[in-house]
Amino acid sequence: MLNLFQIMNMINNDVPTPYGFYFQDSATPNQEGILELHDNIMFYLVVILGLVSWMLFTIVRTYSRNPMAYKYIKHGQTIEIIWKIFPAVILLTIAFPSFILLYLCDEVISPAMTIKAIGYQWYWKYEYFDFINDNGETIEFESYVIPDSLLEEGQLRLLDTDTSIVVPVDTHIRFIVTAADVIHDFAIPSLGIKVDGTPGRLNQVSTLIQREGVFYGMCSELCGIGHAQMPIKVEAVSLPKFLEWLNEQ
């Protein structure tokens, strides 16, 4: 039987779908901003494409009918001013929201907890800095892809892992990403997260998950023969369930 998280993933588009051509449903403010920016820019591009196509069609039709074309099509100060100012305005309209969103995505706002993700060839290791177990040690574990031969009904090939990142919803979370060998990339589409893991360097990204669910990601930097075996699985749960999970560690 499907568990609650699998049913939620069927309602919300939180997993890759065959022949999918659009984004997964957003679960964070950052991803919501990315979707809105994408849709706005696509609108501008469609308008520009239609305008340029109409101009090309009009010019070709005019020249084909009359080789001695209207003089202001070839030499006109007004049209030259228009096609310089109009594209500049469009670029500024696109650029300002992009810069604002880029700044907001890089901003880390008073994180309530920090998780360190370390990329190895070819698995992930996670460390919860803010919590310790009964032995006085930081909670940490490794995450490996589930082999095809061990997949159970409802699990996703090359996406499900033996252990998951468990986080509470409505909580500011900071991910610190690095790597131990080669460059990896920590990417989770539904959360709007994509940050490189570079050996000897710590990169950080902040997120605020707004709903419960299971979110999948992958290493998005070619890192060797086992690159496809580096999935990321995040389970967002309520705070009581998260505390219960912590007590089990």
Swiss-Prot record:
Q: What is this protein called?
A: Cytochrome c oxidase subunit 2
Q: Which residues bind Cu cation A1?
A: 184, 219, 223, 230
Catalytic activity, reaction form: 4 Fe(II)-[cytochrome c] + O2 + 8 H(+)(in) = 4 Fe(III)-[cytochrome c] + 2 H2O + 4 H(+)(out)
Q: What is its main location?
A: mitochondrion
Free-text comment on the cofactor: Binds a dinuclear copper A center per subunit.
Summarize where Cu cation A2 binds, as residue positions: 219, 221, 223, 227
Is this entry keyworded Magnesium? yes
Required cofactor names: Cu cation
Look at the named UniProt entry and state the broad enzyme category this protein falls under: translocase
**Which locations, inside or outside the cell, does it occupy?**
Mitochondrion inner membrane
The regions listed as transmembrane in this protein's record are 41-62, 81-105
Source species: Maudiozyma exigua (Yeast)
Mitochondrial matrix side residue ranges read 63-80
Subunit and interaction comment: Component of the cytochrome c oxidase (complex IV, CIV), a multisubunit enzyme composed of a catalytic core of 3 subunits and several supernumerary subunits. The complex exists as a monomer or a dimer and forms supercomplexes (SCs) in the inner mitochondrial membrane with ubiquinol-cytochrome c oxidoreductase (cytochrome b-c1 complex, complex III, CIII).
From the UniProt annotation, give the residues forming the signal peptide. 1-13
MF terms in GO: copper ion binding; cytochrome-c oxidase activity
Name one process (GO BP) from the record.
Answer: ATP synthesis coupled electron transport
Function recorded in the entry: Component of the cytochrome c oxidase, the last enzyme in the mitochondrial electron transport chain which drives oxidative phosphorylation. The respiratory chain contains 3 multisubunit complexes succinate dehydrogenase (complex II, CII), ubiquinol-cytochrome c oxidoreductase (cytochrome b-c1 complex, complex III, CIII) and cytochrome c oxidase (complex IV, CIV), that cooperate to transfer electrons derived from NADH and succinate to molecular oxygen, creating an electrochemical gradient over the inner membrane that drives transmembrane transport and the ATP synthase.
Positions that bind Mg(2+) = 221
Under the heading InterPro entries, the entry gives: CcO_II, CcO_II-like_C, CcO_II_C, Copper_CuA, Cupredoxin, Cyt_c_oxidase_su2, Cyt_c_oxidase_su2_TM_dom, Cyt_c_oxidase_su2_TM_sf
Q: Which family does it belong to?
A: Belongs to the cytochrome c oxidase subunit 2 family.
What Gene3D superfamilies does the database record attribute to this sequence? 1.10.287.90, Cupredoxins - blue copper proteins
- Which stretches of this protein does UniProt put in the Mitochondrial intermembrane compartment? 14-40, 106-249
UniProt's post-translational modification comment states: The signal sequence of COX2 is processed by IMP1.
